[in-house]
Amino acid sequence: MMSVSLAWPAPAKLNLFLHINGRLPNGYHELQTLFQFIDYGDWLDFKITATPELKLHSNLSQVVPDSDNLILKAAKSLQSVTGCIQGAEIWLDKRLPMGGGLGGGSSDAATTLVALNALWQLGLDKKALMDIGLTLGADVPVFINGIAAFAEGVGEKLQPVDVAEPWYLVLIPDAHVSTADVFQHPDLPRNTPKLDMSSLSPERWSNDCQALVSAKYPQVANALSWLVEYAPSRMTGTGACVFGEFGSQQAALEALAKKPAEMQGFVAKGLNRSPLELRLAQL
């Protein structure tokens, strides 16, 4: 019987700020952001097989085609780089919204790389996994690294940070925001002055995509206008999700209980060390 390994977390991230500093000659945007994890996300289970086939099961009603699925792409990339002839059957319990700015797809890919590297006993170090992850998406290395980070460049230059770990109320507006559309929009601010590590004070944190997305998606604007009545609030990534910062779990839960019925949301704890790091330490 092949080995089964259960309950690998693929946590969400929040961009505590997102500043766009300019546009590079290759068309990519130069940015600065601060990534922090939260104790809420997707879950993956793995059954290791002796043959190289890969199968993915999911609780989603709409399954992403295999050719576009980041979980399968991650597993295949790992096989390709290492020559591994083992395979896996993978179960995804999807809890994070797609197009929400919480990094769900990138986190799923990162957890797949980290878990299969361990379960296939490949022995790649974190840097090698991050290099593979970067070929799958700009945010994947953040989740592999597993530590809250100040990111620069196109998001690939990471410096560990130790910031407060508050409770968050995250709202999920009924909107799917295209990251590509946001970054291509002519009205997106692209000239925010750069911060350095010594000036990462929260009063300077903002999201340069927020005004544009709020104008285009009234669901996002409505969520922000409601949430800001209870706590300092802003959008994560290019949206659509927004978050408010609370001093206690109780305060966040009390606000959640008052949210309008048409809004979805959850309460989660900010974490400077990813739950994936903690899961790996249990092996």
From Swiss-Prot:
Keywords: ATP-binding, Isoprene biosynthesis, Kinase, Nucleotide-binding, Transferase. One of its GO terms (molecular function) is 4-(cytidine 5'-diphospho)-2-C-methyl-D-erythritol kinase activity. It is an enzyme of class 2 (transferase). Pathway: Isoprenoid biosynthesis; isopentenyl diphosphate biosynthesis via DXP pathway; isopentenyl diphosphate from 1-deoxy-D-xylulose 5-phosphate: step 3/6. It catalyses: 4-CDP-2-C-methyl-D-erythritol + ATP = 4-CDP-2-C-methyl-D-erythritol 2-phosphate + ADP + H(+). The active site is at K13, D139. InterPro entries: GHMP_kinase_C_dom, GHMP_kinase_C_sf, GHMP_kinase_N_dom, IspE, Ribosomal_Su5_D2-typ_SF, Ribsml_uS5_D2-typ_fold_subgr. Gene3D superfamilies: 3.30.230.10, GHMP kinase, C-terminal domain (3.30.70.890). Transmembrane segments: none annotated. Its EC number is 2.7.1.148. GO terms for biological process: isopentenyl diphosphate biosynthetic process, methylerythritol 4-phosphate pathway; terpenoid biosynthetic process. ATP binds at P97, M98, G99, G100, G101, L102, G103, G104, G105, S106, S107. Catalyzes the phosphorylation of the position 2 hydroxy group of 4-diphosphocytidyl-2C-methyl-D-erythritol. NCBIfam families: ispE (TIGR00154). Belongs to the GHMP kinase family. IspE subfamily. This is 4-diphosphocytidyl-2-C-methyl-D-erythritol kinase. The gene is ispE.
